Amino acid sequence: MSSHLVEQPPPPHNNNNNCEEGEQSLPPPAGLNSSWVELPMNSSNGNDNGNGKNGGLEHVPSSSSIHNGDMEKILLDAQHESGQSSSRGSSHCDSPSPQEDGQIMFDVEMHTSKDHSSQSEEEVAEGEKEVDALKKSVDWVSDWSSRPENIPPKEFHFRHPKRSVSLSMRKSGAMKKGGIFSAEFLKVFIPSLFLSHVLALGLGIYIGKRLSTPSASTY
């Protein structure tokens, strides 16, 4: 049986500079940092008889070999856990913190609530406009049905009452120009009337004298 001295490497440390607040690496087991462990190695004769001849006794694993096997398992487990912790730390640094998640969710909720409030205000304004339009239409119909017929007002002209005209020959139709009693007609009618009377009177006197003379001559 030959022994070899093997230097056990120190367990890997997680040096993650990006995550200062991440999980710290596990401390190495005590007594393994730069320690030398004696590993018993069997001679490669190929059969058990050679081992029995060389050693003379059956090989019994020593406490150091058992301790070395346990340490190897512990080192492998520690390396595996350190890898998992490093991956968790990187994912922890990459993923947002719960506070940031809550802040993002709160911002999203505030944005959605603002959108809903703006939409609700717009809907209320539109509803009020529709109600006002309906009221105006109803008022217009009521006014149109209650008012009188659409007839333009008449223009009123104030006229003074006619005065009673006094009777006079001057303003009559006969006294007007071309009438019976007009000035031109009277200027012609009166002289002709006078001459006709004079002629009739002279003719009557003459006829009377003629009749009286024969009767006187007969006596």
From Swiss-Prot:
GO terms for cellular component: endoplasmic reticulum; mitochondrial outer membrane; mitochondrion; nuclear envelope; nucleus. GO terms for biological process: defense response to virus; mitochondrial outer membrane permeabilization; mitochondrial protein catabolic process; positive regulation of apoptotic process; regulation of programmed cell death. The chain crosses the membrane at residues 187-207. A motif (BH3) lies at residues 126-148. Residues 42-51, 82-97 have a biased composition (Low complexity). The modification Phosphoserine is found at residues 62, 117-118, 120, 166. The keyword Ribosomal protein does not apply. One of its GO terms (molecular function) is identical protein binding. This is BCL2/adenovirus E1B 19 kDa protein-interacting protein 3-like. The gene is BNIP3L.
